[in-house]
């Protein structure tokens, strides 16, 4: 028995998320089909994140147990010959049997990309969120500071979560701006269901002036979902890195 770790890049546009489903196309389903083709084994993969449909990844981590004699580093090339064009294995290696892509994780980094311009977009919409109203990016940057540290993020969670606790620690949160392209980066020890997308929606409210900068701390502390921003679309969201 061997434990194989994979680092995976995928374009989430045409997937119904990571987690396997009976009828819908998912990243996990395609990956497990590829493993079956090269090993002859029905392996169950563990993913570091359960991304939603439309969410992308530059470095999703997964692992699976196999009896195959294929060298760990060779799974990358072998799997890539069986995977669709919107999934790529960046790295593969054999790891200790104790390693688990999800439960061994110490944190994750996500990015979210916004294009802020009045004119409609002709292309690239599957990788970003278009905001037409002018955003005050300096206020958005200041708002990031309120989220840093350990907080109860109940106000930033969509219904349907099975999380045992809504307390999380955000370790890094910053914005990069290049002309009308705004990239938001957020790292934490874990994220609640739709937490990143709702936090970004709250930042957009700050940027448009709908939410006052000084009210952000109250939104966090009050824990009332309706006081936070909208859950922005998934297409601007990218899993950048998983920490171990």
UniProtKB/Swiss-Prot annotation:
The keyword tRNA processing applies. Substrate binds at residue 110. It is an enzyme of class 5 (isomerase). It comes from the Bacteria. CDD domains: PseudoU_synth_EcTruA (cd02570). Keywords: Isomerase, tRNA processing. Pfam families: PseudoU_synth_1. GO terms for molecular function: RNA binding; tRNA pseudouridine(38-40) synthase activity. The keyword Lipoprotein does not apply. Transmembrane segments: none annotated. Its EC number is 5.4.99.12. Disulfide bonds: none annotated. The active site is at 52 (nucleophile). One of its GO terms (biological process) is tRNA pseudouridine synthesis. It catalyses: uridine(38/39/40) in tRNA = pseudouridine(38/39/40) in tRNA. Formation of pseudouridine at positions 38, 39 and 40 in the anticodon stem and loop of transfer RNAs. Belongs to the tRNA pseudouridine synthase TruA family. This is tRNA pseudouridine synthase A.
């Amino acid at each position: 028995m061997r434990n194989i770790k994979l680092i995976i890049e995928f374009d989430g546009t045409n997937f119904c998320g990571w987690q396997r489903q009976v009828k819908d196309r998912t990243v996990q389903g395609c990956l497990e089909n590829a493993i079956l083709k090269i090993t002859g084994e029905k392996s169950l993969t563990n993913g570091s994140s359960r991304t939603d449909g439309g969410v992308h990844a530059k470095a999703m981590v997964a692992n699976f147990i196999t009896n195959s004699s294929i060298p760990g580093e060779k799974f990358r090339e072998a799997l890539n010959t069986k995977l669709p064009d919107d999934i790529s294995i960046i790295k593969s290696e054999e790891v200790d049997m104790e390693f688990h892509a999800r439960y061994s994780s110490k944190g994750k980094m996500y990015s979210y990309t916004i294009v802020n311009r009045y004119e409609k977009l002709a292309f690239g919409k599957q990788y970003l969120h278009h905001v037409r109203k002018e955003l005050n990016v300096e206020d958005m940057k200041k708002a990031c500071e309120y989220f840093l540290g350990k907080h109860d993020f109940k106000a930033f969670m969509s219904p349907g979560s099975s999380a045992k606790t809504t307390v999380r620690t955000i370790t890094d949160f910053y914005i990069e701006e290049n002309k009308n392209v705004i990239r938001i980066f957020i790292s934490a020890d874990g994220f609640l269901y739709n937490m990143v997308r709702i936090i970004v929606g709250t930042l957009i409210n700050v940027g448009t002036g709908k939410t006052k900068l000084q009210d952000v701390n109250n939104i966090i502390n009050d824990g009332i979902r309706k006081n936070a921003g909208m859950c922005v679309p998934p297409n601007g969201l990218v899993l950048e890195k998983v920490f171990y």
